Each structure stands twice: as structure tokens, then as C-alpha cells.
């Protein structure tokens, strides 16, 4: 199987669908199937010409907003997309199995960090559950963090993943 991952929109749809048709026809001659990732906002549009879709049930929130609690997975972000929806293609579901730190300076998004050691109390102070303040200037992943920068640790909670899974399966089970 070959899988295409494209955040296509209504303006790029025709070009992407043409690519999918050409690739699918070529792959089928070799006995290979083509799948495509499907983002939540794409559920309201036509299905791409592929053998199956994989619905991405992650990266649902506003990553760059300081006010977001968890941009990786939030049931409240997903549920509006799955109300009264049907999709004319079989969908598998992809759930998040990763975490990251979202770094802010002066309430403005700077970068994503994947290797922050929040247990090092010389450099980080926990402010709230999942939010840390930088205590000393230092480098992390080639980025210079400054005192008072904020890092929001995001990780999907198991109970939240299960809740989203139940909603997706209940809503889209016949696909």
C-alpha cells in the first residue's frame, strides 16, 4: 500500500484528485492499493479517488494559541466535525501516540520541542498541570530559551483517546 498525505482544500482539490487517480491506476496495475489521510475538515467534501481513507484524529486544536490546553487531541475540537456526518469511503482511524512541548515567548508561539526535560528544576518550574516556565536562559534543540518563556507540554490522555474513538466509531462505523 502507498499512502498520500495532503492537506488538500477546495482550491487544491482538483489537482490532488487528479494525482490520486493517476497514482491509483498505476499502482493497481502492480497490485498495490492507494490510501489517503483525511483531515476532519475534509469530511464535508468529496472523497479522494483512493481505495480507503485514514481519518486523522489528532492535531485538532490551535497549536499557536497560548490559551489552548492541548492541540494534539481535544474531544471538544473533534465532536463538531463528527455530528451528522457520513463519508462514502471506508475510513480507518489514526489516533495520537506522541507528545511535544509548545514553546512561547511573550505569549507568541516560537516552536515545537520534542526533548524537554521538565524534571530539571534548575531550568523549569511547573506552573500548572502541563505548563512550565523557563527559569534560566539555555539552549534546547538549537533554540535559545530565555527566562520566563513558557512551554506547554501536550500529550493525549488515554481517556480522551477512548472517548474520541467511541465517537468516531459510533458516527462513522458503516463506512
Regions found by a protein language model. Name each.
Residues 18-118:
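Substrate-binding surface in catalytic domains of secreted glycosidases
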Residues 16, 20, 161-164:
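Aromatic/hydrophobic pocket-lining residues that form the small-molecule binding cavity
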Residues 1-14:
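Active-site groove signature of glycoside hydrolases
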Residues 5-7, 51, 148:
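Acidic side chains
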Residues 1, 35, 40, 123-126:
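Short N-terminal helix-initiation segments at or just after the protein's N-terminus
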Residues 11, 15, 69-73, 156:
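Alpha-helix N-cap and loop-to-helix initiation/capping positions
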Residues 98, 106-175:
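Substrate-binding cleft of secreted/luminal carbohydrate-active enzymes
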